[in-house]
């Protein structure tokens, strides 16, 4: 879990344009501790520290433990797309499937 945790922390921090120092300061942690979380496998942060980081980074604490490594906004966009897809008429769904097949062949 920690390797994924470190990756998620680093990715979110960079997406938010935060340095290690700035995020650590905002979450009430030391810069070195945050570096350890991002880079070492053996770290086991407390629930309080994870909650502080989640609050600063704008995600729910369980995000750090989810297997889906996509950023929250990417997941939100995917979810919105599929909700919209479900409401389409059958002909429109078929057109989208054909477009998708065209993209698959091109890659």
Feature-to-residue mapping (PLM):
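A short, Lys/Arg-rich alpha-helix, primarily the initiator
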Residues: 1-15
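Residues that mark the N-terminal boundary/hinge immediately upstream of a DNA-recognition element
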Residues: 8, 19, 46-49, 60
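Short alpha-helical DNA-recognition segment
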Residues: 17-37, 52
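DNA major-groove recognition helix of helix-turn-helix/homeodomain DNA-binding modules
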Residues: 28, 48-63
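Recognition helix of helix-turn-helix/homeodomain-like DNA-binding domains
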Residues: 28-45, 66-69
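Interfacial/linker helices and their anchor residues that mediate assembly or domain coupling
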Residues: 68-107
């Amino acid at each position: 879990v920690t390797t994924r945790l470190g990756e998620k922390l680093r990715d979110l921090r960079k997406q938010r344009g935060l340095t290690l120092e700035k995020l650590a300061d905002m979450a009430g942690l030391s810069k070195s501790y945050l570096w350890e979380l991002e880079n070492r496998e053996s770290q086991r942060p407390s629930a309080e520290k994870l909650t502080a980081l989640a609050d600063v980074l704008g995600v729910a604490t369980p995000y750090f433990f989810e297997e889906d490594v996509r950023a929250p906004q990417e997941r939100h966009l995917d979810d919105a797309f599929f909700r919209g897809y479900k409401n389409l008429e059958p002909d429109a769904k078929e057109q989208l499937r054909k477009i998708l097949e065209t993209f698959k062949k091109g890659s």
